[in-house]
Amino acid sequence: TIGIITNLGGAHDEGFKNWDEKAKEKLRLFENAQDLIYCRDFLPLQNALTKKTHYQQLNTFSWSKKLPADLMVGKLDKGEVDTIIQAVYKNDFIKITIPFIDDASIENCITCWATLLHLGYTNDWVNKRMKSLAPIAMRLELKEGLNHCSVINDYYNSDFGSLEIALDFMVQQKQQPNKTII
């Protein structure tokens, strides 16, 4: 069994005293997993992994933009419609191109990249398939409004992390020169 921790941001913080408690609780979901894929940049998770001896049986595969990891992400080059992600893996410089420019999709693609490398797929194989990814339906909806307006509806969440995602999505929209947040 492979466990994948995608993101432990501010969403769903209710019920936890702090991020350390949240990280420990999320790790409990993977107590019986053989492998764990995660981002080392979320320090409460990294700390929880190193403190608990019963996680030592886990084969971990980490990725990071800041810390030493199995997949060290270096440069992100965002274009108009795609992003080139460069990294170091097993002392080799590798890269992939993904058809997304928003931060949430980039992070999700890096996690998928790490998982596929951990499973033994070649970077060429991964890159070819990443280029053909299609966006999935998200909670953010872009609708045509009245008087030449575009409306972005985020009906799912109202936490700070969700607001950041919605604002990032808004900045990418080029339909109208002016933007209003309600």
Regions found by a protein language model. Give the residues of each.
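Acidic, Mg2+-coordinating active-site environments of NTP-dependent enzymes
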Residues: 2-150, 177-178
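Active-site beta-alpha connecting loops in nucleotide-dependent enzymes
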Residues: 136-138, 155-182
